């Protein structure tokens, strides 16, 4: 295994581990609390707020397509395999930025697919908001997917110029 492949595998494993450990910590802390969706931690800065409150999502982003759970799982697995094939089998060198964005995407997808296999749903627990508005609850895998997508799209629309030798 090449150094690049080894570092890619270790980086993916590291991000997946961050996601799974935080979810496990939230579940263990939640324990057998009587409330279905307890607030485990809450902090406010004026009208801005942050809270840790575990929720369970059986669909895609924002709970969309929850009726098609197994179809979504299949699509997610195909995407993961496609990204892994690109990262490990591509002979032509990929830019570090593109590679990192794909590592983030793959790590987040693996994190959420692991939830589906272990718990039969995705565990979301981070909630942020302003005043009475709140963003849908998310997790670290979602952060990795969002960052990976932003970096990938940025790289597509603003490619670096090749130096002429």
Curated annotation (Swiss-Prot):
It comes from Chlamydia felis (strain Fe/C-56). Its main location: membrane. PANTHER family: LIPOPROTEIN SIGNAL PEPTIDASE. One of its GO terms (molecular function) is aspartic-type endopeptidase activity. Pathway: Protein modification; lipoprotein biosynthesis (signal peptide cleavage). The active site is at residues 124, 142. It is a multi-pass membrane protein. It is found in: Cell inner membrane. It comes from the Bacteria. The keyword Zinc does not apply. One of its GO terms (biological process) is proteolysis. One of its GO terms (cellular component) is plasma membrane. Its EC number is 3.4.23.36. The chain crosses the membrane at residues 9-29, 69-89, 100-120, 133-153. It catalyses: Release of signal peptides from bacterial membrane prolipoproteins. Hydrolyzes -Xaa-Yaa-Zaa-|-(S,diacylglyceryl)Cys-, in which Xaa is hydrophobic (preferably Leu), and Yaa (Ala or Ser) and Zaa (Gly or Ala) have small, neutral side chains. Belongs to the peptidase A8 family. This is Lipoprotein signal peptidase. The keyword 4Fe-4S does not apply. Keywords: Aspartyl protease, Cell inner membrane, Cell membrane, Hydrolase, Membrane, Protease, Transmembrane, Transmembrane helix. This protein specifically catalyzes the removal of signal peptides from prolipoproteins.
